[in-house]
Amino acid sequence: MTATLEVILTPAEFGPLRERDLSQTVCVVFDILRATTTMITALANGADSIIPVEQIGEALEVRRQRPNVLLAGERDGVRIRANQTGGIEFDLGNSPREFSAEKVQGKTIVMTTTNGTRALRACATAKTV
């Protein structure tokens, strides 16, 4: 059995992944500066689940369908604010410190980030992520 390792370093490289058959691929996503660390922190502090989405609009659509979810995310390192969404302030940014048990325990979190959630979504069709 031959194994191949591919390293993708920037969001610009995600596009070609979407065009490939990843059904027999294992994707490992490390966004060590924020997104995956924040997700692990949320789950460790009792969050029920995290729904990663690529775009702010997708997060807002999930909130419309499921009003009890928390919205979390950033663009270029700054929490998403009401002026970016047409008036809806995100509940959390993308810092592990924000995801305390008091805020996230028992909650579903919809998360969108500049890089991390996009990397996860690019690998969505993989056999294992």
Language model regions located:
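Acidic/Gly/His-enriched mid-domain segments of enzyme catalytic cores or analogous surface patches
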Residues: 53-129
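N-terminal glycine-/serine-/threonine-rich phosphate-binding loop
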Residues: 1-61, 67
